[in-house]
């Protein structure tokens, strides 16, 4: 006798769907393999051979639509997270003392309603949903290999803990969380145990009670038919895959006696209802309208016209960040910073804020230094207009000044250091480290005052870090001014430059010149343009005066009398 065609591929299949998972419907057909249905299955597997058709030996259907022995075959349509109770759960939850959790009491009420309405629609096929304890325990005890003597590794245990829902730890509405959401000082073990990504999953098990007739309701006879997993991204994992055109899956059970040993076959089919053409068209129209409105919203934010600047001008746009400060004496640091624009040729838009103060930040030990991470963003823009055409004038660039202070328990501040750095003249991303210093007094009294009271010397003009704006001489002397080197401040700057000079690409020489040289060329072009415009106006006036004269005076052919 030929062997029947069974599906041996029990691996999982992955699907992706944008539709709500609640519309998923599966049809599970379970049947015991007996001599009659086994022979009936042979012709389908041996198509094209001269075999006797045994379909006539198939047992007739009963008037009720079921086979005479309802324990031999069952077919159920199951929805996503639909709960079908097993005989074991029915017997368990009928005893009120066995109900311990609110979910157990809910299951008890549902079972009592089913008993009053005529009983369950299923006999052997049942389900475990994402809320059941079986889902947590099965995922925690799941093996990675097929070895019977497998010992789970540390990584396997950690990943099992990541995937568990921890049903017993779900908080009740209105209760206070016992665990901290943010761990401010994580230990090395905490970092090692919590580095894995936890993707939210919902799991559902389709089970079958394959016990002998009249002995249903024992855990030992429960077998997994299918495992369904759905994550928040719409990825559906089915193990094993839908039967489709493949043969049915086979399960063999063993019992203490020969009559308790049996074989079963089952199929899993996707019977989810397809969307109607009208619904698909309506959905496409809704998505098209949604995307169109989102596109219009983005267009309204960007605008239709590209913002241009005047010829000979340069627009500097800076997205900056105060990254960190390290190497200072006291804790709880904050930074006061501002941008100074040169008085000549530079300007900023109205209501432009060129200064800022970071938040107070506690330091963290990093090697021998204490580092305070601010990650404080700031943004500003400025305009440069080249108007001075004298050869002796050199363009100046904006300067970023910073002042580092510390705050104690009584809200008293101390100056920890001053620093300054010239903004980069080239566009792109730049990371700048600014070294700072602070003025100091000699003697122990000054240090005691700084420690207990918090007072310290400060600069009246912060621009004294470089060249003060009020200085008009040729040489600046700081002789006798005592300072002490302190820590460093790290800035991250993303500089953007916009100018019409960048459009000049006629020759390699122009491409290699700096933007300031191009801006100077724009000023020369502007003066030449003014001369040409004045010549055109003079020529136009001459033509108007010529047209107003009599023709006999203008005509060169006239004769003298």
UniProtKB/Swiss-Prot annotation:
InterPro entries: C2_B9-type_dom
Upper classification of the organism: Eukaryota, Metazoa, Chordata, Craniata, Vertebrata
Assembly: Part of the tectonic-like complex (also named B9 complex). Interacts with TMEM107. Interacts with TCTN3, AHI1, TCTN1, TCTN2, CC2D2A. Interacts with FLNA. Interacts with TMEM67. Interacts with B9D1 and B9D2.
GO annotation, cellular component aspect: centriole; centrosome; ciliary basal body; ciliary transition zone; cytoplasm; membrane; MKS complex; nucleolus
Any Pfam family hit: B9-C2
UniProt-recorded name of the protein: Tectonic-like complex member MKS1
Functional summary from the UniProt entry: Component of the tectonic-like complex, a complex localized at the transition zone of primary cilia and acting as a barrier that prevents diffusion of transmembrane proteins between the cilia and plasma membranes. Involved in centrosome migration to the apical cell surface during early ciliogenesis. Required for ciliary structure and function, including a role in regulating length and appropriate number through modulating centrosome duplication. Required for cell branching morphology.
Tissue specificity of this protein: Widely expressed in embryo at 15.5 dpc, with a relatively strong expression in brain, liver, kidney and digits of the upper limbs. Highly expressed in bronchiolar epithelium.
Organism: Mus musculus
GO biological process: branching morphogenesis of an epithelial tube; cardiac septum morphogenesis; cilium assembly; common bile duct development; determination of left/right symmetry; embryonic brain development; embryonic digit morphogenesis; embryonic skeletal system development
Keyword terms: Cell projection, Cilium, Cilium biogenesis/degradation, Cytoplasm, Cytoskeleton
Localization per Swiss-Prot or TrEMBL: Cytoplasm, Cytoskeleton, Cilium basal body; Cytoplasm, Cytoskeleton, Microtubule organizing center, Centrosome
Domain C2 B9-type: 314-442
């Amino acid at each position: 006798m030929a062997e029947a065609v069974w599906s041996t591929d029990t691996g999982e299949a992955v699907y992706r769907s944008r539709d709500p998972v609640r519309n998923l419907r599966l049809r599970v057909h379970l049947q015991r393999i007996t001599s009659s249905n086994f022979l009936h299955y042979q012709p389908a597997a041996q198509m094209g051979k001269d075999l006797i058709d045994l379909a006539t030996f198939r047992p007739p259907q009963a008037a009720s639509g079921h086979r005479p022995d309802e324990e031999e075959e069952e077919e159920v349509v199951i929805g996503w997270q639909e709960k079908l109770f097993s005989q074991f759960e029915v017997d368990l939850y009928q005893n009120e003392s066995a109900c311990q959790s609110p979910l157990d009491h809910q299951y008890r009420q549902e079972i009592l309603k089913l008993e009053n309405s005529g009983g369950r629609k299923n006999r052997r096929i049942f389900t475990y949903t994402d809320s059941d304890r079986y889902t947590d325990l099965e995922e925690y005890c799941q093996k990675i290999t097929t070895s019977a003597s497998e010992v789970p590794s540390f990584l396997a245990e950690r990943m099992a803990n990541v995937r568990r829902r921890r049903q017993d730890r779900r908080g009740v509405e209105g209760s206070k969380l016992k665990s901290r959401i943010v761990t401010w000082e994580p230990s090395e073990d905490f970092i090692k145990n919590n580095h894995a990504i936890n993707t939210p999953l919902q799991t559902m098990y389709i089970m079958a009670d394959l016990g002998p007739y009249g002995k249903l309701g024992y855990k030992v006879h429960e077998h997994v038919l299918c495992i369904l997993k759905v994550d928040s991204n719409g990825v559906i994992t089915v193990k094993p895959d839908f039967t489709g055109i493949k043969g049915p899956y086979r399960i063999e059970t063993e019992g203490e006696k020969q009559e308790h040993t049996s074989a079963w076959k089952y199929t899993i089919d996707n019977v989810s209802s397809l969307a109607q053409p009208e619904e698909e068209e309506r959905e496409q129209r809704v998505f098209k309208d949604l995307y169109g409105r989102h596109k219009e919203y983005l267009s309204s934010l960007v605008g239709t016209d590209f913002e241009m600047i005047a010829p000979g001008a340069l627009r500097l746009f800076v997205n900056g960040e105060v990254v960190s400060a390290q190497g200072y004496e006291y804790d709880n640091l904050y930074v006061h910073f501002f941008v100074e624009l040169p008085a000549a040729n530079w300007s900023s838009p109205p209501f432009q804020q060129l200064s800022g103060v970071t938040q107070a930040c506690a330091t963290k030990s990093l090697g021998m230094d204490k580092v305070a991470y601010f990650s404080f963003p700031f943004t500003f823009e400025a305009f440069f207009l080249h108007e001075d055409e004298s050869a002796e004038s050199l363009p100046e660039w904006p300067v970023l000044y910073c002042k580092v202070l510390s705050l104690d328990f009584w809200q008293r501040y101390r100056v920890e250091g001053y620093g300054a750095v010239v903004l980069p003249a080239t566009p792109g991303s730049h990371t700048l480290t600014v070294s700072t210093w602070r003025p100091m007094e000699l003697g122990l009294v000054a240090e005691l005052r700084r420690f207990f009271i918090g007072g310290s010397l400060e600069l009246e003009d912060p621009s004294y870090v470089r060249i003060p704006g009020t200085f008009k001489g040729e040489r600046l002397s700081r002789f006798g001014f005592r300072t002490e080197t302190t820590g460093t401040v790290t800035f991250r700057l993303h500089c953007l430059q916009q100018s019409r000079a960048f459009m000049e690409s006629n020759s390699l020489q122009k491409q290699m010149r700096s933007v300031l040289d191009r801006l100077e060329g724009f000023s020369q072009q502007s003066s030449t343009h003014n001369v040409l415009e004045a010549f055109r106006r003079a020529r136009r006036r001459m033509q108007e005066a010529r047209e107003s004269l009599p023709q006999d005076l203008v005509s060169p052919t006239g004769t003298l009398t």
